[in-house]
């Protein structure tokens, strides 16, 4: 269940409605997503088992983390199960380089408040991150939690997409 939507959910919405034909980034970049519940439970447990003032990365390891390309493929496959997505013949978004995306977003912003400028503007703040492969180490985090287990990212994304589709991003009862 999605209780609070953020940039990730908004990006999926743009994708579903065909407003995102270009995606900044590289397919192989890992995206370190965690659920709110996971973070709350982890912090609660960390307060009991960690040294005071220690720094811990509350995230999954790179090998437990889906890439941008995998997430787009999973979302596209899930959206393709919906009749209203299929009938619009929406194509998978294409990856574009950082310079091209910046130029496009800047030109769209100069055109004023259009659907395109709004959709690109919602992605622009984190676009640079989608070009950088980061390998975040969570060894201390894993050691501190008794029952650490990363969720299956495919199952998680399918559930998120399913909820967003069912509620149409919060516009319908879930």
How should each PLM-predicted stretch be described?
Residues 1-8, 71-77:
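Short secondary-structure boundary/capping segments
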Residues 3-6, 31-37, 66, 136:
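Residue-level signal for the nucleotide or nucleotide-sugar donor/cofactor binding architecture
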Residues 20-32, 53-59, 122-126, 142-148, ...:
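Glycine- and acidic
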Residues 39, 43, 58, 71, ...:
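Non-catalytic, hydrophobic alpha-helical segments
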Residues 46-124, 164, 171:
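Mid/C-terminal beta-alpha module of Rossmann-like enzyme folds, strongest
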Residues 85, 91, 127, 131-174:
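Amphipathic terminal alpha-helices
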């Amino acid at each position: 269940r999605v209780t609070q939507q953020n940039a990730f959910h908004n990006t999926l919405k743009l994708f579903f409605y065909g407003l995102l034909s270009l995606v900044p980034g590289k397919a192989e970049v890992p995206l370190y997503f965690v659920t709110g519940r996971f973070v709350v439970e982890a912090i609660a447990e960390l307060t009991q088992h960690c040294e005071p003032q220690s720094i811990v990365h509350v995230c999954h390891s790179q090998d437990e983390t889906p890439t941008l390309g995998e997430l787009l493929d999973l979302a596209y496959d899930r959206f393709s199960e919906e009749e209203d997505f299929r009938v619009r013949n929406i194509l998978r978004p294409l990856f574009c380089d950082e310079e091209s995306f910046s130029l496009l977003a800047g030109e769209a912003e100069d055109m004023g408040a259009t659907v395109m400028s709004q959709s690109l503007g919602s992605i622009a703040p984190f676009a640079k991150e989608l070009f950088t492969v980061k390998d975040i180490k969570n060894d201390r985090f894993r050691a501190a939690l008794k029952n650490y287990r990363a969720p299956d990212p495919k199952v998680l994304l399918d559930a998120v997409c399913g909820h967003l589709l069912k509620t149409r991003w919060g516009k319908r009862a879930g």
